[in-house]
Design a protein with these regions (language model features):
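Phosphate-binding site recognition
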Residues: 1-330, 334
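A cross-kingdom feature that marks ATP-driven nucleic-acid transaction machinery
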Residues: 301-467
Length: 467
């Protein structure tokens, strides 16, 4: 399915700026599947002389043969024997370009290196001895983020110090995702974002002339739809035991977020389960989270699902596939999705509100310039009860502490008072604290009056999220 080029203007501008420097470039582009890496590169290359090769999951010999054919086709050569090595292939391009600016893209680069571990060293040698003196623009692109970060960008990689630029390409945040959802109300935009996430190809499945319910039924509850089997197809492409990985994602989607809870739920050894979890993190499918201010090794570590479409699918589709495939899609909507969706949207809304603050922070439009943002959870020493803070953003001892409510009623003063108490549980030694209240349905008169008296209270409703 062809992906339209929407957004990514900054990323495209950055690539074109590097291209304009007219010297050797080694650019590394990575990010999980479907975020639009290939679409960005196609857009970048469309007005430039370029050789674009997408590696395949075959052996080194076959990849080299197909790469050779791509190169010979670019130079209008025929009846030539394939290159005997990658060094010969790259040297041929280097010699033929003769000062001409050419872009060489190798997509799915990890497929090549897994079959030929010496390839990275071959690249290193060529860069150091010839390529760096020319103006070839090389892009190495990959979806396995752990591999790209360690084997290509890492300090022990033969290519360490040779790259001239890199980009970790992520899914769109809610703000950029709205470019695909312009025909909907503010509430429906966020509800659709909660199901389709920020992946461009998934957002393109939304029909602008249909409502939220119809879009969910047509895209997730119809067995012929593009998204109906998408998560399973992606897992089969990336891992050898998709069933176990799928069980882990489902467990997290059902609320089992600690490592021991996940291993118990799926019936796997804890150590083995952690290996699977690490792989899913490296693929960008799940993420690791610790309370704000605590080390990554914290015993309070939990896991979440990065891609909202995966989160929706494993919560509502995976466990209901038998019903869906026997024609009960309307019943699945009425009994399983619609009654639970407001609860599901609570976590989605928190993510949206965090994105909102991050964008405002980057523009310098907040009372502080925070250096980190996250959630916090811990124990109230007075009551011995668990306390959770939806958002904490901080810089030194200045904090913005937020509460996010996706409810049908207006947020009242009790929520503000409770948030102040939570802030004290988190830390009593704060220099300055701002309280940010996010509400789907607005605020009571008492909350609005309090915010007018106290500049440390910031109110954000749905309209403000879209300004």
């Amino acid at each position: 399915m062809e992906e339209k080029f929407v957004g990514r203007e900054k990323e495209l501008a950055d690539l074109n700026e590097l291209y304009a420097q007219d010297r050797f470039q080694l650019f590394v582009l990575y990010g999980r599947r479907r975020v639009g890496k290939t679409t960005l590169l196609n857009e970048f290359c469309k007005d430039k002389k370029s050789i674009f090769y997408s590696a395949e999951q075959s052996n080194d010999k076959l990849n080299l043969e197909k790469f050779s054919a791509q190169v010979f086709g670019f130079y209008n050569e025929s009846n030539l024997e394939p290159f005997s090595s990658w060094t010969n292939a790259l040297s041929y391009i280097d010699e033929r370009q003769a000062g001409e600016r050419i872009v060489l893209v190798i997509d799915e680069f990890p497929y090549l290196v897994r079959k030929n571990r010496a390839l990275l060293s071959e690249f290193q040698h060529l860069i150091d001895h010839s390529l760096k003196n020319g103006n070839l623009f090389i892009v190495l692109c990959g979806s396995y983020m752990g591999f790209m970060e360690k084997e290509v960008l890492g300090s022990k990689s033969p290519l360490f110090g040779r790259r001239t630029g890199q980009l970790h390409m992520k899914s769109f945040d809610y703000h950029d995702s709205m470019k695909f959802l312009e025909n909907f109300s503010a509430e429906d935009k966020l509800k659709l974002y909660g199901a389709f996430g920020g992946t461009p190809l998934y957002l393109q499945q939304v029909a602008p002339n249909k409502g939220f319910e119809e879009n969910i039924k047509d895209n997730f509850l119809k067995i012929t739809s593009y998204l109906y089997e998408e998560p399973l197809l992606l897992l089969r492409q990336e891992v050898q035991e998709p069933g176990v990985y799928s069980a882990i994602i489902e467990a997290i989607a059902r609320g089992y977020t600690k490592a021991n809870e996940i291993s118990t739920k799926i019936g796997e050894d804890a150590a083995k389960c952690l290996k699977y979890i690490k792989t899913l993190c490296e693929l960008g499918i799940i993420y690791k989270e610790t309370p704000f201010g605590e080390k990554e090794t914290s015993r309070k570590t939990i896991y979440g699902i990065s891609d909202l479409m995966f989160r929706f699918w494993y919560r509502y589709v995976f466990t209901n596939r038998t019903l869906i495939e026997t024609g009960a899609r309307d019943a699945v909507w009425l009994k399983r999705i619609e009654p639970d969706y407001a609860n599901y949207m609570g976590t989605v809304f928190e993510r949206v509100c965090k994105d909102y603050l991050s964008v405002k922070n980057a523009k310098g439009e907040l009372p502080i310039l925070f250096t980190s943002i996250g959630r916090w959870w811990g124990t109230d020493p007075a009551t011995k009860s668990q306390v959770e803070i939806d958002i904490i953003a901080g810089d030194s001892d200045d904090y913005m502490i937020g509460e996010c409510k996706w409810r049908g009623e207006k947020l009242d003063i009790s929520v503000l008072n409770d948030l102040r108490h939570k802030a004290d549980v988190f830390s009593k030694t704060r220099d300055h604290t701002w309280y940010v209240l996010f509400s789907k349905s607005g605020f009571t008169d008492a909350v609005i009056a309090e915010s007018k008296k106290d500049d440390s209270i910031i109110l954000v409703d749905l309209d403000a999220l879209f300004k």
